[in-house]
Amino acid sequence: VIAAATVGGILLATVTLYGILGGADFGGGLWDLLAGGDRRGHAPRQLIDESITPVWEANHVWLVFALVIFWTAFPVAFASVMTAAALPLWLAVGGIVLRGAGFAFRKEVSGLGLQRAFGAVFAFSSLLTPFFMGTVIGAVAAGQIPADASHASLAAWTNPTSLLIGFLFVGACGYLAAVYLIGEAARRGNRRLQVYFTRRAQAAGAATGALSLATLLELHAPAPALQHNLTGRALPLVILAGLTGLTVLALLAAGRPRGIRVLAALGVAAVVWGWGVAQYPALLPGTAVTLSNAGAPHSTLVALVVLFAAVVVLIGPSFGLLFALHGRQLLQGGEGLTAPAGGRAGAGSPARPRRSSGQPGRASRVVAIGLIAAGAVARARARGGRNR
């Protein structure tokens, strides 16, 4: 039981990391979509591009890790979720692929029409991907995933709770991105873009808070136990999420943005962990599937804990170095955005394309392959134990 709970906590931690890092990337695409025409949206899009370019692919490491843990540690629940929510999952995967392709190829083409087309693919995929991810989480939280799912279910992810959580995911991504971009604009000394993204952070923060409250109220019918736990044992985390959100909005209104990145990330993390604490020990609410009775053999769970420790030791410092270099603007290929820019640019296209920045990195692929291989080894070990 302890091993299963530990692995469940690790799974939630990786989901949290993907949410606060990868979610901000999706939010950048959302603001790219809403930036306006060529001239009006030129400066915001350039800042978004310069902020995302060095780190946009690396954040998916956490998604791969989360999927490997879920598949290896809790195969029954994994199979049910992947079967019942197959359509939104495939749409989310397709969105990730199209988003990456649009982001990379818009740097490689020279025609204005193609730049606009790839920019639109990047922007719309950034909107749809978190939405469909949210509907899957909503299907789980609302108890719409059966324990023995044998076919895809449209009703599982199109109910009001799932749709609300889908919109909540989009709002949270936009909120995180706007808050992070305020700091990026400040680092470049661009006061106009600071004000620009401050307004958007305030709007996205208010919308996300309203959606969170609406979701909490909506859970009364489909998942009363989850709602009860959110207002019970998980209440401190719910309060923390609300307080951090209100503090960020207050600091933005006062023109004192120092520390808002940490507060915004903490608020989103509190929401994720509040859900996890409220749902514990159920993996699939409404069924008998729990962390303890649906987990892999003990040896497999221990192997996953060791794997996570290795990931922290090997990948953690690398991510720290990556973000440190990015924070000091040492990964930029040019001078960066230091003043409001003008001129013509394709929708969603950077003003100064940097071809090398858009290329997929080898490191992320190596890490992903390694994690999948480790998961396969753990599964093989588990099967060997059963055969003996």
Question: Could you say what each language-model-derived stretch is?
Answer:
Residues V1-A58, V64-L67:
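N-terminal signal-anchor module of multipass membrane proteins
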Residues F105-I260, W273-G274:
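Long, contiguous internal "core" modules enriched in hydrophobic/ aromatic residues
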Residues P160-G174, L301-G316:
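Hydrophobic alpha-helical transmembrane segments
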Residues L226-P236, A294-V312:
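Membrane-interface transmembrane-helix boundary segments in multi-pass integral membrane proteins
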Residues G267, H326-R355:
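Short, highly charged, low-complexity non-transmembrane loops/tails of multi-pass membrane proteins
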Residues S357-R388:
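Hydrophobic alpha-helical topogenic segments used for membrane insertion/localization
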